[in-house]
C-alpha cells in the first residue's frame, strides 16, 4: 500500500517562489523514515534536511513539485494557487494508486478533498499534517530543500537578502536598498505583500 504526502515551503515569504511538493511512499517504509528522523522540516537544520532528502528520494516511489512564482502569487489568491498545485500533484502521483493523501490544512480545502474522493482515495487533510504524518513530513523536507536551492541561486544573482521573509531585518533592508536604486523591482519580490506599503510603496500592487 502506498500513501502520498503533500506540503509547501515559502508560503509566507516576501521573496522567491512557493514550492509545493508531493511524495509517494510505501506504507511499510514510513516507520523507517520516522526512525531516522523524518519530521517537520522546520524542526531540522539545513544540513540534516539535505541528508534526509537523499534518503527520502531513495525510499519513495516518486515525488513531484510545483513552483508557484511571485508573479502568480501577485495575481491570484494564494490559497487557490496552493489548491491548484496540490491537485496537480495528486494527479501526477495517482499512477502509484495511493490509498491515502495527507495534506496540511490551509483554509477551505474542500476542492482538494473532493478531487481526492473522486479518485477513490482517502483524504487526510489536517492541521499540522507535516508534524503528525511521516509522508507529509517527507514532502515538507522535499519542498524546503528544493526551495533553499532556488533561494541560493537567486542570492547569487540579486545579492544576500537573508531568509526572504518579511520578519527578517536583513530581508527588509535589502528591499529598502533595492528600492532606492531601481524604479522597477526585481521579479523575485512578491509585490502584493503589504509590508511593501511601508518599505517600498511604489513597488506595492493590490491584487484586487
Curated annotation (Swiss-Prot):
Its EC number is 3.1.26.4. PROSITE patterns: RNASE_H_2 (PS51975). One of its GO terms (molecular function) is manganese ion binding. GO terms for biological process: DNA replication, removal of RNA primer; mismatch repair. A divalent metal cation binds at residues 7-8, 104. HAMAP family: RNase_HII_A. Belongs to the RNase HII family. It is an enzyme of class 3 (hydrolase). The lineage of its organism: Archaea, Thermoproteota, Thermoprotei, Sulfolobales, Sulfolobaceae. Signal peptide: none annotated. InterPro entries: RNase_H2_suA, RNase_HII/HIII, RNase_HII/HIII_dom, RNase_HII_arc, RNase_HII_hlx-loop-hlx_cap_dom, RNaseH-like_sf, RNaseH_sf. One of its GO terms (cellular component) is ribonuclease H2 complex. Its cofactor is Mn(2+); Mg(2+). Keywords: Cytoplasm, Endonuclease, Hydrolase, Manganese, Metal-binding, Nuclease. SUPFAM superfamilies: Ribonuclease H-like. This is Ribonuclease HII. NCBIfam families: ribonuclease HII (TIGR00729). It catalyses: Endonucleolytic cleavage to 5'-phosphomonoester. Manganese or magnesium. Binds 1 divalent metal ion per monomer in the absence of substrate. May bind a second metal ion after substrate binding. It is found in: Cytoplasm.
Amino acid at each position: 500500500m502506498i500513501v502520498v504526502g503533500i506540503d509547501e515551503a515559502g508560503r509566507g515569504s516576501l521573496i522567491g517562489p512557493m514550492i509545493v511538493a508531493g511524495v509517494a511512499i510505501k506504507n511499510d517504509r514510513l516507520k523507517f523514515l520516522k526512525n531516522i528522523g523524518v519530521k517537520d522540516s522546520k524542526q531540522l537544520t539545513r544540513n540534516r534536511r539535505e541528508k534526509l532528502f537523499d534518503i527520502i528520494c531513495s525510499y519513495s516511489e516518486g515525488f513531484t513539485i510545483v513552483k508557484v512564482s511571485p508573479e502568480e502569487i501577485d495575481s491570484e489568491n494564494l490559497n487557490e494557487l496552493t489548491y491548484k498545485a496540490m491537485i496537480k500533484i495528486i494527479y501526477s502521483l495517482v499512477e502509484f494508486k495511493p490509498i491515502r493523501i495527507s495534506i496540511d490544512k490551509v483554509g477551505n480545502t474542500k476542492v482538494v478533498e473532493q478531487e481526492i474522493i473522486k479518485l477513490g482515495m482517502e483524504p487526510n487533510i489536517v492541521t499540522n499534517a507535516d508534524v503528525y504524518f511521516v509522508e507529509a513530513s517527507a514532502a515538507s523536507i522535499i519542498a524546503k530543500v528544493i526551495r533553499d536551492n532556488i533561494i541560493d541561486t537567486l542570492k547569487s544573482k540579486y545579492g544576500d537578502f537573508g531568509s526572504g521573509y518579511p520578519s527578517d531585518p536583513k530581508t527588509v533592508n535589502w528591499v529598502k536598498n533595492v528600492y532606492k536604486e531601481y524604479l522597477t523591482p526585481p521579479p523575485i519580490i512578491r509585490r502584493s505583500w503589504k509590508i511593501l506599503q511601508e518599505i517600498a510603496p511604489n513597488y506595492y500592487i493590490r491584487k484586487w
